[in-house]
């Protein structure tokens, strides 16, 4: 008796599919659900610059409890030049000033905000210093 019920249900399903098609076939007739992403030529799925900029940007410490900030608004990650987002806080230091920083808070650093890769000073200064693990 049970096998008859299963057979009848399968037969009904087969007739339904034969008459109406599958839901995927209906989507294909409407032009939906059939396109595959072109992984070789598409940038819709990955921001390749973000993917290449996976190294942490070197940041400096400060004495007033605000967030640590990078020296300028760009850094190199492997061979990629990485840029901090606009309005990101930064220190506007010359290369000479940055090289002479120590792990003690002895340098008054100009604070700014990034704008298209440039640290634009905002008129404030704070003592900044290298984190002990900051590479040269």
UniProtKB/Swiss-Prot annotation:
<feature type="glycosylation site" description="N-linked (GlcNAc...) asparagine">
    <location>
        <position position="64"/>
    </location>
</feature>
<comment type="function">
    <text>Salivary chemokine-binding protein which has chemokine-neutralizing activity and binds to host chemokines CCL2, CCL3, CCL3L1, CCL4, CCL4L1, CCL5, CCL6, CCL7, CCL8, CCL9, CCL11, CCL12, CCL13, CCL14, CCL16, CCL17, CCL18, CCL19, CCL22, CCL23, CCL24 and CCL27.</text>
</comment>
<keyword id="KW-1015">Disulfide bond</keyword>
<dbReference type="GO" id="GO:0019957">
    <property type="term" value="F:C-C chemokine binding"/>
</dbReference>
<dbReference type="Pfam" id="PF19429">
    <property type="entry name" value="EVA_Class_A"/>
</dbReference>
<feature type="glycosylation site" description="N-linked (GlcNAc...) asparagine">
    <location>
        <position position="61"/>
    </location>
</feature>
<feature type="glycosylation site" description="N-linked (GlcNAc...) asparagine">
    <location>
        <position position="92"/>
    </location>
</feature>
<feature type="glycosylation site" description="N-linked (GlcNAc...) asparagine">
    <location>
        <position position="122"/>
    </location>
</feature>
<feature type="glycosylation site" description="N-linked (GlcNAc...) asparagine">
    <location>
        <position position="100"/>
    </location>
</feature>
<keyword id="KW-0964">Secreted</keyword>
<feature type="glycosylation site" description="N-linked (GlcNAc...) asparagine">
    <location>
        <position position="78"/>
    </location>
</feature>
<keyword id="KW-0732">Signal</keyword>
<feature type="signal peptide">
    <location>
        <begin position="1"/>
        <end position="28"/>
    </location>
</feature>
<feature type="disulfide bond">
    <location>
        <begin position="73"/>
        <end position="114"/>
    </location>
</feature>
<protein>
    <recommendedName>
        <fullName>Evasin P991</fullName>
    </recommendedName>
</protein>
<keyword id="KW-0325">Glycoprotein</keyword>
<dbReference type="GO" id="GO:0005576">
    <property type="term" value="C:extracellular region"/>
</dbReference>
<dbReference type="GO" id="GO:1900137">
    <property type="term" value="P:negative regulation of chemokine activity"/>
</dbReference>
<feature type="disulfide bond">
    <location>
        <begin position="90"/>
        <end position="119"/>
    </location>
</feature>
<dbReference type="InterPro" id="IPR045797">
    <property type="entry name" value="EVA_Class_A"/>
</dbReference>
<feature type="disulfide bond">
    <location>
        <begin position="109"/>
        <end position="128"/>
    </location>
</feature>
<feature type="disulfide bond">
    <location>
        <begin position="55"/>
        <end position="77"/>
    </location>
</feature>
<feature type="glycosylation site" description="N-linked (GlcNAc...) asparagine">
    <location>
        <position position="41"/>
    </location>
</feature>
């Amino acid at each position: 008796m049970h096998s008859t019920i299963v057979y009848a249900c399968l037969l009904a399903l087969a007739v339904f599919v034969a008459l109406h098609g599958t839901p995927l076939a209906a989507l294909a007739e409407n032009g939906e659900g059939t396109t595959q992403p072109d992984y070789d030529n598409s940038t819709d799925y990955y921001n390749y610059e973000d993917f290449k900029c996976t190294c942490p940007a070197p940041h400096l410490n400060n004495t007033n409890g605000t967030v640590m900030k990078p020296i300028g608004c760009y850094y190199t990650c492997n061979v990629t030049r990485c840029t901090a987002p606009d309005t990101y806080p930064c220190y506007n230091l010359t290369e000479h000033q940055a090289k002479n920083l120590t792990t003690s808070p002895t340098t008054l650093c100009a604070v700014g905000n990034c704008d298209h890769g440039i640290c634009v000073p905002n008129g404030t200064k704070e003592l900044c210093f290298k984190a002990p693990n900051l590479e040269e």
